Curated annotation (Swiss-Prot):
Recorded GO MF terms: rRNA (guanine-N7-)-methyltransferase activity
UniProt keywords, alphabetically: Cytoplasm, Methyltransferase, rRNA processing, S-adenosyl-L-methionine, Transferase
Name of this chain's protein: Ribosomal RNA small subunit methyltransferase G
Keyword Cell cycle: no
Residues involved in S-adenosyl-L-methionine binding: 99, 104, 122-124, 150-151, 164
UniProt gene name: rsmG
Originating species: Chlorobium luteolum (strain DSM 273 / BCRC 81028 / 2530) (Pelodictyon luteolum)
Purpose of the protein: Specifically methylates the N7 position of a guanine in 16S rRNA.
The family this protein is said to belong to: Belongs to the methyltransferase superfamily. RNA methyltransferase RsmG family.
Primary site of residence: cytoplasm
Length: 238
């Protein structure tokens, strides 16, 4: 599938990966160590650099809030990595980041798991231009950004679908359903009371092809006060 044409925007940053924000680096190293997320120094450098790239692109395109209430390295980068606490990304695994926006959670996870293949999809061309620019600047060989609507991905199959969107779980499951392989899973970063969302997703699954067959909730509010009421949601396909 060929990406759609999108607006040409020049990358706002084109610097080597070095001498990046030492405070952000120390924060990320400490956070990852506290959760047993093993990353080498080069991966830490790339994650910090990605945070900088995200901020620079955000000045041109609305990728994340411009009124941040927490450091980008915590609120966006580390938050994305927390999915790996509940899903072991493996070599050769095919992962779809649905509605990636500014590359979240796909780019941080692609940095952390270089042997896993990530496809980042968004319906907004400018966002995909930004994502591909960041992927290129970071030198990632296992991530690709595609300008597409989910309905246009027919015929593709993935082991895992990721989402950080605010859409209800039933909607996300509906998007993921035709794209997930048998035994695959949908992993979402969500917040708030999800009881009704989960019930609706399970009901709809039971009335269609059985996906999701189960839903797990993993609270992350004990990791940082910022993650109050936030959870990782794992919806499985048998």
């Amino acid at each position: 599938m060929k990406p759609k044409a999108s607006h040409a925007l020049r990358s706002p940053i084109n610097t080597p990966i070095m001498d990046h924000d030492s405070e952000a680096r120390q924060m990320l190293e400490s956070l990852c160590a506290s959760q047993g997320i093993a990353l080498d120094p080069a991966q830490i450098d790339k994650l910090v650099y990605y945070g900088e790239l995200l901020g620079e692109w955000n000045m041109k395109i609305n990728l994340i809030s411009r009124k941040e209430d927490a450091p980008v390295i915590l609120k966006h980068v580390f938050h994305s990595l927390l999915i790996s606490l509940h899903h072991p990304f493996t070599e050769g695994e095919k992962v779809l980041d649905l509605g990636t926006g500014g590359g979240l959670p796909g780019i941080p996870l692609a940095i952390a798991f270089p042997k896993t293949d990530f496809l980042l999809v968004d319906a907004t061309g400018k966002k995909i231009t930004a994502c591909q620019g960041m992927i290129t600047a970071l030198g990632l060989k296992n991530a690709t950004a595609l300008h597409s609507r989910v309905e246009e991905l027919k015929g593709l199959a993935f082991d895992t679908v990721l989402s950080r969107q605010v859409a209800p779980l039933a909607d996300l499951a509906r998007y993921a359903r035709p794209l997930l392989k048998k035994g695959g899973m949908l992993a979402c970063l969500k917040g708030g009371n999800l009881k009704k969302e989960i019930a609706e997703a399970l009901r709809e699954g039971a009335e269609t092809d059985g996906f999701p067959s189960s839903v797990e909730l993993h609270p992350i509010d004990d990791i940082s006060p910022f993650f109050s009421e936030k959870q990782i949601v794992i919806a499985a396909r048998q």
